[in-house]
Amino acid sequence: MDSVTLACGNGGKETNALIERVFMPYLKEFIVAFDEDAPKFKASGEYCVSTDSFVITPLIFNGGDIGKLCVCGSANDVSVQGGEPLYLNMGFILEEGLEIPLLKQILQSIQKELFKANLKLLSLDTKVVPKGSVDKLFINTTCIGKTIKPGISSRHLKQGQAIIISDTIANHGASLFAMRHEIKLKTNLESDCQLLYPLLKPLFLSDLKIHALRDATRGGLASVLNEWANSSKVKIVIEEEKIPLKEETKGICEILGLEPYALANEGVFVLALDQKDAPKALEILKSNEKAKNACVIGGVFESPYPSVVLKNAWGFERILEMPEGELLPRIC
């Protein structure tokens, strides 16, 4: 089998061959129950669930591919709600003609991330559509996790809280911009795509009170902060010079006229907690090499009008607006 055919979606021999020869070598060990339409699992306590669809182009990019992204993306959405990711449901929409070697490469990435995340697969589905109906491969995932750090909400921001960022921003969006065919900038910049739970677990197990937590994906830092300000009816002030930014990312943004605060991340989170707890939180985060750039970038203030303010090194302030329009389609 060199490529996916429409017959691979007929539910018969060709479908079974696709599943057994292509999917199962990579995913079999993670599947909870075979030959069942709806596997069962036992649960007690509070759980969180997140569904996401992945349509990124190109399928393989610097620092990852759609396989790595779909596992990390769904698991991260559960993690930033204080949950430990446990189960994943996956649906694959395959375009007729999709090369089997490419599909296997993506499945291998999924396998690698499932190992890292210690995730099990509850259900798995494949559909094949005629050529041109989708662009090679779309993946839908639903992640289920158990809440181990309750009380996290975008409505819990109050005056006196600090805003922490876990790493340099905008690397995913900037790297995707640079490698798109219409731009083609030469760069070694990679996406920051990664699992966040290993970074967050020590915080969750500490006695720190986390008020708000979000992964800064589509819309970037600007989107997260504006959503928080509107949900909690507060003013958030961010100091521009404190926001960690790679020189290469900064250069791409300057060349293309982009604002890094609005670009997507796939392995960066934003955290709000009491100012007195910020040093301990940073100490915990920086014990992991992947969070060595974590820092306080601003704070929360009372205001009759929800807003996000960006203050530069000279003390001048401007409103950091919610991103508008489509900067770059299909980044995740």
What are the language-model segments listed below?
Residues I31-A33, K40-S44, L114-F115, P130-K136, ...:
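Solvent-exposed alpha-helices and their adjacent loops that cap or buttress functional pockets
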Residues F30-D35, N118-L124, D207-A216, V237-E240, ...:
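Flexible, glycine/charged-enriched surface loops at secondary-structure junctions
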Residues S287-C332:
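Acidic, Ser/Thr/Pro-rich beta/coil linker or hinge segments at domain junctions
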Residues A272-P279:
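Helix N-cap motif at beta-to-alpha junctions
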Residues E95-G97, L189-N265:
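Active-site-proximal betaalpha loop/short-helix elements
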Residues K146-D192, K311, R330-C332:
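Phosphate/diphosphate-binding glycine-rich loops and adjacent basic-rich segments that engage nucleotide
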Residues M1-V22, L320-L328:
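N-terminal amphipathic/basic leader segments beginning at the initiator methionine
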Residues T5, K13-I165, N171:
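Glycine-rich phosphate/pyrophosphate-binding loop regions near the starts of catalytic domains
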